[in-house]
Each structure stands twice: as C-alpha cells, then as structure tokens.
Amino acid sequence: MRILLPSQEQRLLSVIRPGEPFGPRDRALITFAIHTGLRSHELCGLDVGHVMTRDSFPRQWVEVVGKGDRVRQVPLNPIARQAVLDLVHFNRSRGFAVAGSSPLLVTRCHRRLPTRSLRDLIQRYRERADLDIQCTPHTFRHTMASRLANCASLPVVKTVLGHARLSSTQVYTHTTPAQLVAGMDRLAES
C-alpha cells in the first residue's frame, strides 16, 4: 500500500529529534507535506510569501504551479497552517531570511532545499523509524488524497491534487480492510 497509516505517520514523526539542527524544520516539513499532498517540486519551490501574509499570518490557501504548468490553489488545514508557522519560526530563529520572496525550505547554506535533498531526508527518517513502506513526498501525496477521499467527494480530491481527469485521482485513493468492512456495515444499516 502506498499510504502511511496514522500509526506509521506518528512513528515517522517521533524519530525526528527536536534537538537536531534541522529537526524542527523537518518535522514541520513532513507534517506540511502530509497535510497538503504537494509534489516535491511544489514543496521545494515555495517561498515564504506563498504561505504567509504580509501581516505574518499563515494563508488559508497556497497557490502552486503543478504539472502542465497548471496553477491550482490548495487549502491549508489548521495542521498545515501550524506547520507553516513552525517553518517560518525555524527560519527566523536560525537567521534565515523570512521575506516574502525567500525560500520556505532552506539548506544550511541558506539556499533553497533541492528536491533530491527532500527525498533523502525523508528516506533517512523512514530508515530511522524502521518503516517497511516506501516513504517519499509522493507517498505523502497518496496519504493525503486517500484520507481526503474518506471525508470529501472525488471531485474535491481531484481539484486539490490538480488532476485534469478523475481517473488520475482514483489511483490515489486507497481503501483499507477496515474501510471495506465499515462500508459494508453501512450498507446493511441502510
């Protein structure tokens, strides 16, 4: 299965040590990725101004350019907005720029985090957590889409993911055995 179960997500986040130099950033970054489903290039391409207002409040939406240069707006839930605040706080506390045009995700050298480095850091935490599941930004995308499909319609999931066709979205929705049982139980009740 290409999604993280809540217990796996907690295990992954629990191995990120807050005392490590980039631990707070990495925890907020992974949380943000899981709650937005953004692609790796979309995450790494974010500037502070994409997610924060000029008044230093997290935005309700983030506008990203996806595949095919299609622009879409992704709503930020309360957990994603808190992750934004944590990322900006981390940058400020480490002396990284927090102006609107500054990269949200930065390296030790104050440069934009490359997508390869993003994948590497996620892999490092996956190994530390001893998860037996592939863990990439795309796994987080599948996780978000699958969770969203449990509480919203497929057209909503399609729009958030930025898909042109509903058939593309269906690949991202994963059903667990517990969901199948619950669905059949609801059928019996109707």
Model-derived features: positions:
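Conserved catalytic core of the tyrosine transesterase superfamily
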Residues: 1-190
